[in-house]
Amino acid sequence: MKYDALFTPFKIGNMEVKNRFVMAPMGTNSSHIDGCIANDEIDYFEARAKGGVGLIIMGCQFLNPDLAQGSLEGILQNSYVIPQLTTVVEATHRWGAKICCQISCGTGRNAFPNMYGEPPFSSSDTPSTFNPEMKCRPLSEEDIKKIMTEFANSAIIAKNAGFDAIEIHGHAGYLVDQFMSPVWNKRTDEYGGSAENRMRFATEIVQSIKQAVDLPVIFRIALDHLFVEGRTLDESMELIEILEKAGVDALDIDAGCYERIDYIFPTAYLGDACMDYVCKEARKHVNIPIMNAGNHTPESALRLIESKDADFVMFGRQFIADPDTVNKLMSDHEEDVRPCIRCNEECVGRIVGRLTKLSCAVNPQACEEERFAIKPCSQVKNIVVIGAGPAGLEAARVAAAEGHNVEIYEKTNMIGGQLSVAATPKFKDQLKKLVKWFEVQLNKLDVIIHFNYEVKADDQILKNADQI
């Protein structure tokens, strides 16, 4: 098998993961306002577990509603959230996957003012990200102690729900990162100054969780902020050494922060495996497992694992685009893997821009697995699809998958419509891959395509069709 090395088991602490594929943590913005996750989210994660992923890291679950700031992610404050969490855990375990609960104490300076107009909290009175004229409120030592208590409480909730591991969100210039980084941490007490002091907030979180539950702890951290005055890769090495000594069982590493948000949601422009460069240096400094994210492909994943610079490779949006990616690779059917086009339109864009739940430009079933499930038709119809653009191709694919007889009429000599035109630049190769994927799928489904045929309003083919 081409990707054998990706299908070997590996341990994080006492947790054995069946392969090297990790679903990167991404919010879905689909939970209920009370902090309980929704059934759509359960179906979403189960589909990825069924698709062969070894470890799923859920999008961040907040300590309390104030930190969540209205975003519809889970909140680990009260025990009434446990039943729904147990359901998602058991749904993923059913398919042999492990599942990790990511816990967050919020975005700090990246947050908006609260409902009373008060500035967000941060490590120091650093400027707010969205309004530099507004200075953040530094956390007091009492505030910090409360956060440690809340982390322990949230960890217990995660443990009771059955999670296999816990990840601390120390990434992207969020609150934990604001303590770790001198560009934002100007404190003069025991939480500021030296690297050891700046790491105290993070290591106390690790200790709070470790004292509360016996689960592996993963720490998510960007090793290279990629902006002037931000933390560099070299400067981060001392920090990950401190994290290992504090008891962290694995590191989830990449690059970027809100000042370089193109790396937080890596675009097509950045190319493949755009953050794997952090792994080689990190490997020299720690002996715990390393996982890495950032526009990976099966080929880049294989290179990274075979180099031993990382132990797990993380895929985020690719698993949104095709939940069965892993199983298709394992069965040597890479041609059936639907590619993520790295557009950020219907995943990140829907959540950030429209405040609605996650979907996908190439997979409308994402977060709608049950409602949009493809089921065998009760009566076979003759269906005509006019135009072989992306909408026509998907309509034809779904209709044929349901069992209908489908024919496409396209006025040019090629499929893809504007996708094929847009795919001209080298960095848009993912669009070419999507067009090729449609070609393969339609061929396997015996969809007939008539090229150079412009359908007229009175065309006989329309009269003969059961559905257009």
Task: Describe the residue ranges of each PLM region.
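Flavin-dependent oxidoreductase catalytic cores
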Residues: 1-386, 390-406, 414, 461
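Acidic, amphipathic alpha-helical patches
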Residues: 301, 438, 458
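Short hydrophobic core segments
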Residues: 409, 464-468
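Beta1-alpha1 glycine-rich phosphate/pyrophosphate-binding loop at the start
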Residues: 385-452
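A conserved short coil-to-beta-strand element within the FAD-binding core of flavoproteins
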Residues: 451-463
